[in-house]
Amino acid sequence: MTAILITGYRSFEIGIFDHKDPRVSIIKQAIRKDLIGYLENGVDWFIFTGNLGFEQWALEVANELKEEYPLQIATIFLFETHGDRWNEKNKEVLSQFRAVDFVKYYFPNYEQPTQFSQYYQFLLEKTEGAYVFYDTENETNLKYFLKKAKDMPHYQLLLLTFDRLNDMSQS
């Protein structure tokens, strides 16, 4: 079994608030290309954390690819309370993350800051690599996860950057 964690910018972090934003289709084209590459190289599990934005779009693409490839999808939420305060539109997306092949909640609820590092350590230990939409020019809290991932020998990282997206949109 080979599992890849998929994570990246949340929609508000890159200013995309409408699913019909033309940038979403460019991002999804890149996702499709990269996920097919993973599948053709033996990956059989895509792991998500349940965030809006990049993960949401990658989940949509992964579900489409299930018609062509034998893949499994999991969502490992940080807390059972994930998404409880979301609006109805976003809760529809949350239901898609809960309708995958495997769902786990790492903690019942928030108690202390160390839960975040424990969660990311768990994700790193349970996956062989990560596909991350992230650019060092636009830092977020993902930088902590990426630092841990880069420190792990043999952990494979594939970054989708703004430069890669620009190249794809021009071709």
Swiss-Prot record:
It comes from the Bacteria. HAMAP family: UPF0398. Belongs to the UPF0398 family. This is UPF0398 protein SPy_1647/M5005_Spy1353. It comes from Streptococcus pyogenes serotype M1.
